[in-house]
């Protein structure tokens, strides 16, 4: 994989994933170093001219009225870094932290932050040498993640532990092994480290990636469920969905048609089917389409934020001046994340309803609870309790957190977004949905097997994509022909979803 050249302006979400998951190397564009130097020059000239500059020659928060002498700046940097590193466990994953770091490195290169070259190089070197700071997940309110991402700075100066080659070691030890030196903090470096929403943005980027793949797998398993039901395929027609015009719906319907290519559902000699199926079947792909529409909203604002500065004050290179601002606000993005959570709750409820219905013989014309025909097993009867539990938790997790905040710092900081918390809740929903989608794969495959076992079951042949999903599951979970631990089946199916085994080749 080629080296990613960062310049502050054109980082993509795919670039973030490449760095976070695959360890893609990064380098800093030459013109970015020039912008960093110009920003420092402007800041120092204005300060020498007597201009009060927040976070540079003045304190931060309620201490904005405290003057900081130039001789005290290095000490102030260390004091502020230590005093603000207050995050609480559990810790973010390595992938999340790497996403945070590449995002913060990128948007500081615009030149609005007064970052030193050494600070930018520290981000680059930690990424390229596989040294990952341990960032606590809790403690930030999303109005710049000042109490959590400051732990990155402590790692840079060698004062905290890091994840390195599968072990937790001191940052100093990891740097020594990689031939790196601790960062010497200069000018406004600590303020640059802390005045960023990179925890919320980095975790949101990972969330987007996970949801994109979950939706694809959910659509494929939904189609397999549709085959288990012997459902009416008409709602998936291209012309019908184009008539409505919703982008997510159109994409998901097209994906379902592709997965069902060659399916018996398109055959003229299949058994009689219902004229109209329940909405969670008839419009299942429309519900995942709504998830994709919410994703589009999140990606729009996230892509803007990872390529723009959140620094306060910000240096305007063309104006040769510094301006206070509130560009670290993440309200638009957090509203998108909470909208995504609501969309995922709709998906959760739809899966739940589908699986409860699949246990009803009057609906499926298959044995009750999809039990083997010999009547010797309970099938999936008690799984409904697990489904309902997970769905109830998902409903609870949709409760907005972005409007829960308190005035702080003498009421100067009287607004917040709780973006990191909103993302954390949404990612828990994703993990719950992995179980739900895995259980839908179990139900769907069992329904297909039961339909094949009918006296006239030769008509059952699966689609191009659904056959792959069926084969992936049956490679680890055999057909239920008698009582066995469904607990094991559920966890095996979950693992397949977690490892994204149900995705098509190349996705």
Language-model features: where?
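Polyanion/phosphate-binding surface patch
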Residues: 51, 66, 252-253
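C-terminal auxiliary extensions adjacent to catalytic cores
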Residues: 2-24, 29-31, 35, 39-42, ...
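Short, charged/polar low-complexity linear motifs in solvent-exposed/disordered segments
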Residues: 73, 80-81, 416, 456
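Glycine-rich, flexible loop motifs
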Residues: 1-14, 19-50, 75, 80-136, ...
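FAD-binding core of FAD-dependent oxidoreductases
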Residues: 54-76, 83-108, 134-157, 167, ...
